[in-house]
Amino acid sequence: MIGAPARSGGGLRQFYENPDVPLSSGADRARRQARMLADTLKDVTGPACVVDVGCGDGEAAAIALATSPGHRLVGIDWSADALCRAKARGLTLIRAAVDGVSLPLRTGTADVVIMSEIIEHLVDTDSALDEALRVLKPGGSLLLSTPNLAAWYNRGLLAIGMQPVFSEVSLRGVFGRPGSVVAGHLRLFTSRSLTGLLSARGFGSIELSGARYHDVPRLLRPADRMFCAWPGAASIILVRARKT
C-alpha cells in the first residue's frame, strides 16, 4: 500500500515511514484482489510469479496466495514498518522504492503484476507503469485498482464546492471534504484518464469494473453498490490489462 517516493522530498519520505500511517489492506480490498488474481491465474499454466507492487502489510497478498496456492508471490514496498508486518505472513519480500526508479526484478519474469491502490500514491505514474510492463512476460496481466475521482458522490460534492473524497491538499490534515484520515494520495483518476494512461504506456486489452468503498455512510451503501455496475461512477476503479 505504501509506494516509496524515490524522487520526492523529505516530507513524503517521513510520511510513509510514519508508523501511524494506515498500512492495512482492509478486508474488502484484500478479498477483491484475491478474486481478481484467482480469475487471472486460471489462464496460467504451471506455477506463476505474481508481483505485488506496494504490498503494504501483506494482508491482501496473503489472502490472494491462499486463494490461489502453488504460485510464487513477491511483495515490494518502501515502508520498513509495513514489510515487518508482512514478514509474519510468509511472503517473499523486497524493500525497494517503486516511484521513479527501476524495480529490482529482471525483465519478463512476472505473470501478474498487482498495483492495488498504490498508483494514487505515486509522483511518477508513467515510470511505475513502464516498470510494470517491463517485468511482465508477454501476455502477462496487470491488476490495478484505484479510487475514482468521478465517483457518484464526488460529482455532487464538487457541485457544491467541496473537495472530492479521496483527494488531499495536505499531508497533515484533511480539509474541505468528508473524512479525517490522510492517506497520502497524490494522483487521482477517472476511468477515462486511467484508460488513456494505460494505453499510452503500452498496455492493451484494458477491462474496467467497479467496486464499492467501505467507508461510505450506511444509508448510502445501497447506492454505492448500485453504481458498481458503472465503472465511470463507481467508488473504486478495477482494471485488468495485458502486456501485448
Model-predicted segments: where are they?
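S-adenosyl-L-methionine-dependent methyltransferase catalytic module, highlighting the catalytic core
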Residues: 3-32, 59, 78-81, 85, ...
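Conserved alpha-helix/loop element of class I SAM-dependent methyltransferases that forms part
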Residues: 28-46
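A short beta-strand submotif of the Rossmann-like class I SAM-dependent methyltransferase core
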Residues: 115-116
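Structural signature of beta-strand start/N-cap positions in the alpha/beta core
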Residues: 49, 72, 109-111, 141
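Conserved class I S-adenosyl-L-methionine
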Residues: 47-56
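Class I SAM-dependent methyltransferase SAM/SAH-binding core
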Residues: 58-101
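A short acidic, Gly/Pro-enriched loop at the edge of an enzyme's catalytic core
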Residues: 101-112
